[in-house]
Amino acid sequence: MEIEYICRHTIGTAPRAAEELWVMLGDNNSWSRLDNWFYKCPEDDPRLLTQDYVLEHTPYVDVIARQHPGRFQTTTHSEKRIDFVYCTPALYDCVTRAEVVRDDYTEPVRDPKKLSNFWHPSDHRPIVVDFDLKKARKQ
């Protein structure tokens, strides 16, 4: 799995990573078990494997899931959350805001005049996370 390689060669190289300021984010094209209350897919569904690895083998915290427990936050034009922001507990303590931006501009709209898979402004919604790094310096 690509995510295993990525994690082992980045955060996996830092013995005290949970106490350091690490972040990993992106379009992972996979689902999180933390959202399975919404998806209701079988426990052995392969779409959960990538995020399972991150949650089980790294100190990373899923920022959106932690900030909005019990509230599904779709990040695409359909009801899926495949974009993730992870950070270590030390950095999570600095989070002041975390949200998937949903407004008239960020609402994905298919544009049939262009390519069949073209969405305006994007097929993904932006995720905003604000960190107050002054809090990290005090620790």
Identify what each model region corresponds to.
Residues M1-H9, M24, W31:
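Active-site beta-loop-alpha substructure in enzyme catalytic cores
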Residues G12-V23, S30-Q139:
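Metal-dependent phosphoester-hydrolase catalytic domains
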